[in-house]
Design a protein with these regions (language model features):
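Class I SAM-dependent methyltransferase "Motif I" SAM/SAH-binding loop
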Residues: 37-44, 118
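Class I (Rossmann-like) S-adenosyl-L-methionine-dependent methyltransferase catalytic domain
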Residues: 1-33, 43-46, 56-95, 99-106, ...
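Conserved catalytic-core segments centered on acid/base and nucleophilic motifs
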Residues: 47, 57, 113, 119
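Gly/Ala-rich phosphate-binding loop of Rossmann-like dinucleotide-binding domains
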Residues: 51-52
Length: 210
């Protein structure tokens, strides 16, 4: 799975990327002064938006192409520190991206978690391990904003994968469903090409307000 995503970035096949960021984040995020974990962050401009709201933002990404593209496209200067995961730290905003395997991120603690592209990127047999590792990094009662997709996987398949409500609540029973809307026009082109007629974006948040 790791090599799959690295190859997609290498080939420029990144139909899941949202160049303008995620609109649901901007509608529903209210927190400030948090240390926010963003797993499998890619080059999303959501990192900048979260930092501009007064948060310290920490992303984790497999692809060096994605990390380099993020800093170039956002015109951010940065410094690099070597470690088990290479650390790219912006000089102008409180943003850090760790390059490498998310499951090797340890010794960190976060009081907020934003996931727009991680859970839906993982096949079913990888999701429970992702959730368990994420929980190990979060403080008690950490704030969470999760964005998932629901669609007919007989008509099209991921990634990004459909993750339906019963599965989400098995993983995160503390989450409440805030919003559901058809987001097929903003989804990966391959879904429309496959004839998919609906792709529901669902927004979940922890029961404690951000």
């Amino acid at each position: 799975m790791t090599e799959f995503w690295i190859e997609r970035w290498r080939e420029g096949r990144t139909g899941w990327h949202q160049p303008e960021g995620n609109a649901s984040l901007r509608r529903h995020w209210q927190g400030t002064g948090r240390r926010v974990l963003v797993p499998l962050c890619g080059k999303t401009p959501d990192l900048v938006w979260l930092a501009e709201q007064g948060n310290e933002v920490v992303g984790v990404e497999l692809s060096d192409i994605a990390v380099g593209s993020f800093f170039e496209e956002q015109a951010l200067s940065f410094e690099v520190r070597d470690g088990e995961l290479r650390e790219y730290r912006a000089l102008d905003l409180p943003i850090t991206i760790f390059l490498g395997d998310y499951f090797r991120l340890r010794g960190e603690s976060f009081d907020a978690h934003y996931d727009r592209g991680a859970l839906v990127a993982l096949p079913p047999d990888k999701r429970a391990a992702y959730v368990e590792h994420t929980r190990s990094l979060l403080a008690d009662r950490a704030e969470q904003l999760l964005v998932t997709l629901e669609y007919d996987q007989d008509a099209a398949n991921g990634p990004p994968y459909a993750v339906h409500a019963d599965e989400v609540l098995d993983y995160w029973p503390e989450l409440v469903r805030l919003e559901s809307r058809d987001d097929l026009p903003n989804g990966p082109p391959k879904f429309r090409e496959a004839g998919l007629t609906e792709m529901i974006e669902v927004v979940w948040r922890s029961t404690r307000d951000l």
